[in-house]
Amino acid sequence: MPSSLLGAAMPASTSAAALQEALENAGRLIDRQLQEDRMYPDLSELLMVSAPNNPTVSGMSDMDYPLQGPGLLSVPNLPEISSIRRVPLPPELVEQFGHMQCNCMMGVFPPISRAWLTIDSDIFMWNYEDGGDLAYFDGLSETILAVGLVKPKAGIFQPHVRHLLVLATPVDIVILGLSYANLQTGSGVLNDSLSGGMQLLPDPLYSLPTDNTYLLTITSTDNGRIFLAGKDGCLYEVAYQAEAGWFSQRCRKINHSKSSLSFLVPSLLQFTFSEDDPILQIAIDNSRNILYTRSEKGVIQVYDLGQDGQGMSRVASVSQNAIVSAAGNIARTIDRSVFKPIVQIAVIENSESLDCQLLAVTHAGVRLYFSTCPFRQPLARPNTLTLVHVRLPPGFSASSTVEKPSKVHRALYSKGILLMAASENEDNDILWCVNHDTFPFQKPMMETQMTAGVDGHSWALSAIDELKVDKIITPLNKDHIPITDSPVVVQQHMLPPKKFVLLSAQGSLMFHKLRPVDQLRHLLVSNVGGDGEEIERFFKLHQEDQACATCLILACSTAACDREVSAWATRAFFRYGGEAQMRFPTTLPPPSNVGPILGSPVYSSSPVPSGSPYPNPSFLGTPSHGIQPPAMSTPVCALGNPATQATNMSCVTGPEIVYSGKHNGICIYFSRIMGNIWDASLVVERIFKSGNREITAIESSVPCQLLESVLQELKGLQEFLDRNSQFAGGPLGNPNTTAKVQQRLIGFMRPENGNPQQMQQELQRKFHEAQLSEKISLQAIQQLVRKSYQALALWKLLCEHQFTIIVAELQKELQEQLKITTFKDLVIRDKELTGALIASLINCYIRDNAAVDGISLHLQDICPLLYSTDDAICSKANELLQRSRQVQNKTEKERMLRESLKEYQKISNQVDLSNVCAQYRQVRFYEGVVELSLTAAEKKDPQGLGLHFYKHGEPEEDIVGLQAFQERLNSYKCITDTLQELVNQSKAAPQSPSVPKKPGPPVLSSDPNMLSNEEAGHHFEQMLKLSQRSKDELFSIALYNWLIQVDLADKLLQVASPFLEPHLVRMAKVDQNRVRYMDLLWRYYEKNRSFSNAARVLSRLADMHSTEISLQQRLEYIARAILSAKSSTAISSIAADGEFLHELEEKMEVARIQLQIQETLQRQYSHHSSVQDAVSQLDSELMDITKLYGEFADPFKLAECKLAIIHCAGYSDPILVQTLWQDIIEKELSDSVTLSSSDRMHALSLKIVLLGKIYAGTPRFFPLDFIVQFLEQQVCTLNWDVGFVIQTMNEIGVPLPRLLEVYDQLFKSRDPFWNRMKKPLHLLDCIHVLLIRYVENPSQVLNCERRRFTNLCLDAVCGYLVELQSMSSSVAVQAITGNFKSLQAKLERLH
């Protein structure tokens, strides 16, 4: 038991969490008890048979039949069967015996509650319950040899023919129909009135010859097959069908012992001189589809009818000698004469045992158990017949005082009960009853026995078909439900005692096999009260907890006839139910949980497993000395860790609380009431056909009748607990609890030198601690009983309505949840589901225009824990809301909606907010959505813990704050979801009503209430305005976040609220999506003309290290920041703003270079992974020029970018600059190598012009001399046009005088390169081109400079002519000389 439940009894104000924990603990107790009830042993385990090849024997030990030994006086006088009720034969029948000539037989047909008698060729039937309703058939002329009642095959006869009566004579087999006028459907019980009961149809349905086969017995299977036993030792079957076919007759006889075609060959005079072994008995196991036969000589044969019951094959045959030999080898000390003859065989169905299939009873009362297949294989087909156990009857143990059975001539075995009719003398029988109902969990098997005298010879002995409660097997519990039926003690609260009928010539003898509860009732009535030695012995025999559970069946009975017995049972419950105890660790073995039943109390060397309710064989051992322990049950650790428990007084750290029999009896009884449904699925899916469609419906897994029965039992238990609230106090009628405290502290070791007074106080404290723990547990169980009753009452109410429709109203998720929910879950933890089911039920009323007040009051009456006053308010509000849908008057509709809103607001913290808001949306009551959601948020978090949690950074350790925060957000979500719906609708593409989707008449819109785009937009604006009025800061924040999320930032920026700026600032600092919030923040500042703040936010955005922002966006942010900064400086003249603007402009310059680097890398090296990483890096942040140069421009050899960086930095290094220009030119030439010469010249010219225009104004970064020289060398090398460089420089805008100066210096430098290239006149050609351009267009030089430049040109030409004259004459020299002389003349004309 958790420590939280040990402090004190649960007060009314106990928290919901503590109540829930108590319920969970109570549920676990029930789970454990239910599991223990289901762990009953199989018959093979009771018989200690582990496998077919390991046979065992029992019956020779005193403990096999505890009542046969000297312990008899210690056991209460418990009758096993009720007093016998004798019903004489109808007087008309007695007269018929005088007319008998050949033969008479008698038997019972339990399915129709009839006994039958044949006298020669006539058969009579009557109701054996009262001797009335006598019917007869005298339509046969031959003596009747065998009689059988058959439930016919389906679909062959008319529905009123419920059974067939099969009669066999020496000549033919006649099949008659039985119909019933007043048969109760499904009950199998005939109406007792003489006028309207059974009718025997006069004309036979079938008649076929016996072919001279003497038939001895007739039996049928549940599926309508008819088997007959022949005196010739053969097994026959009558096969019948509706109509004859080409190769089959309507009715024919098949001999399964010889040939399937034997009906074609008559057996003439077969039984006249036969030495065959007649078959005396046929037994059919309908649960496994196996048929057994027993012959006159004791041969047992096994036939497999197939998995589906339609086959037929003989699989085994064992002779009586083989059986006797096997039994003798198993029970070697027993005289073999008791093993034969076998007088009866009985099937053991799979509801009783999975491993044992057949029981044979001998004339001495010995039971022989057989198996037909390997153990633990429930689906295996029979393949053998193996004797696995020999059970001797009472009287074979050494100390037995009971006389052994003898001369058994008739036996009946049914569900563990063996009845044997033994001949006492010629006129009378002794009826033996042997069973293990008292000890169903005890291994090896222990049985009780009793005998009763029977007047007359027993002609027939039969069990009356009992009421059977169907197991509720569902997907959730199918693996936990045993295949075999629970013992009687587990089911006795809901099943009546088993009924038997014995027929003799004097009439029918009716009696019941008493259940333990019937035996207890007998003791209470006999003792006229709840006290007495016999009752105390009953409690010791069954153990306190099991006896208390049995006692509760009577104590909780609400029947008027049980009122006095109920009071006696209550007294016995409290008197003998024990007390809670504290068990201490001890060096002695723990006390057995077996009470002193037949002798002195003893300690068991190992306690019986918890929940094992029956005695341990050791209870007849040597008595031990010491405290006599009352019966105990599963202990619960009360204090500390059991591992630390000690045995002395100085360190009692780990005692265990052992609950009383009263406590455990209540648990057991409750678990047995609920056991059939506790862990079953609430619902099952069933598929049925509607026309050609298959429809899946969800139905209750438990029928109403069973619910009614469970509710009746639960109500009795609940009233008992409410009536006897003192059960958690001290022992009844024993106020002096301290006197016996030490007896309740099991294993407590008295300290040698302890203070007696101190020890007594400690003992008293421990005892009260155990009492308190039990009281708390019982209160939890009481609450569980109450909740269970109310949950099942609700479930029954749902079943009485249209359950399938109610469930269909649920949301799909809840329907799926329903499929995986057990009744236990529904009771303990599924309040949401019960609420939804109730809401669905009420909605069905509302939909049918029925008032909900009546059903609401009924719900409050039957399940107030599930349907409170608040729930009733909710139902009323829901009714108003639903009724408003029907109202056409706008004012009235608004009034009803307003009224519903007021009702909902009363319980807004409990209402299904999303559902109500969805309905408000449907009726366009958007104001209600906002108001109800905000009210709900306030009620769920009245102290504002959610906002506190949010503002303090959402600390993980603040669980309460987190819960309040989530509750508020869930409430706000209803508003934002509604806004979202309106947004979506306002943007939806309107459908053109003029264009039909398909041919035919116009189709109405599927939703006539759908909003138009304009209406949706209007409602959105109205709702947004209403939302903005809220003073709820956390809601405002939620609204802002939603607007951002759905890209309605423009709407957000229109909000005039004091909460907006702090929220954006906060989110820009802490949210993972900082970029988005900073972007909104600068826009907010800009909109509110706070330009300085906008510029600084934009600057932070540009500087932010983030992969969300591209480099291009960063440049845009800086550009926007510069604009805002300029606007700020225009408004105010703060020096800091001016400095900030300067910083922004410098930042922009560097950023552009960074962009240039990135674009260059993307353009030239995009396929390299390292380049891709570099490009991403350049996107992630703004870098300084040092980093750009060292980490990007230089490593990737980006000459242009390096030139831009040193230009930006103002760094002057002529050699570096020249190298960069050379790299730029060479890179461009390299990139264009595949192009034609003209294209290459064009590409290079574009590049030089582009860069020249940037750097020509700063000669340090545009070394003209070097560039012209390098370019001319490339032109010379590539044989390009002579004027290429001059044209390029002209496009850059280099002045002609400066260009002439450069070329003149190049020529005069006499670089050997030109001679090496064999073009010594190249530069003169270039100068000639340059000057010709001037002559042709003198305006290239300013007018004021023109004369001086012309003179300069003439002087230079003269110099060039002198140089040419000094050169050796050649065609090229002569040509250039002529060109310069012509030029000279033109220049002189310009002079």
UniProtKB/Swiss-Prot annotation:
Q: What does this protein do?
A: Essential component of nuclear pore complex. Could be essessential for embryogenesis. Nucleoporins may be involved both in binding and translocating proteins during nucleocytoplasmic transport.
Record's protein name: Nuclear pore complex protein Nup155
Can you tell me which residues are glycosylated?
526
Give the record's membrane topology: Peripheral membrane protein
One Gene Ontology MF term: structural constituent of nuclear pore
Q: Which UniProt keywords apply?
A: Atrial fibrillation, Disease variant, Disulfide bond, Glycoprotein, Isopeptide bond, Membrane, mRNA transport, Nuclear pore complex, Nucleus, Phosphoprotein, Protein transport, Translocation, Transport, Ubl conjugation
Its predominant location is: nucleus
> Do the record's keywords include Chaperone?
no
Q: Name one GO biological process term.
A: RNA export from nucleus
GO cellular component terms attached to this protein's record? cytosol; membrane; nuclear envelope; nuclear membrane; nuclear pore; nuclear pore inner ring
Taxonomically, the superkingdom here is: Eukaryota
Entry's family note: Belongs to the non-repetitive/WGA-negative nucleoporin family.
Subunit text: Interacts with GLE1. Able to form a heterotrimer with GLE1 and NUP42 in vitro. Forms a complex with NUP35, NUP93, NUP205 and lamin B.
Which part of the chain holds the cross-link Glycyl lysine isopeptide (Lys-Gly) (interchain with G-Cter in SUMO2)? 740
Compartments, record wording: Nucleus, Nuclear pore complex; Nucleus membrane
Q: Which residues carry this modification: Phosphoserine?
A: 1057
Clinical note on disease: Atrial fibrillation, familial, 15: A familial form of atrial fibrillation, a common sustained cardiac rhythm disturbance. Atrial fibrillation is characterized by disorganized atrial electrical activity and ineffective atrial contraction promoting blood stasis in the atria and reduces ventricular filling. It can result in palpitations, syncope, thromboembolic stroke, and congestive heart failure.
Q: How is it modified after translation?
A: Phosphorylated. Phosphorylation and dephosphorylation may be important for the function of NUP155 and may play a role in the reversible disassembly of the nuclear pore complex during mitosis.
Q: In which tissues is it expressed?
A: Expressed in all tissues tested, including heart, brain, placenta, lung, liver, skeletal muscle, kidney and pancreas.
Q: Disordered: where is this region?
A: 985-1012
Keyword Transport part of the UniProt annotation = yes
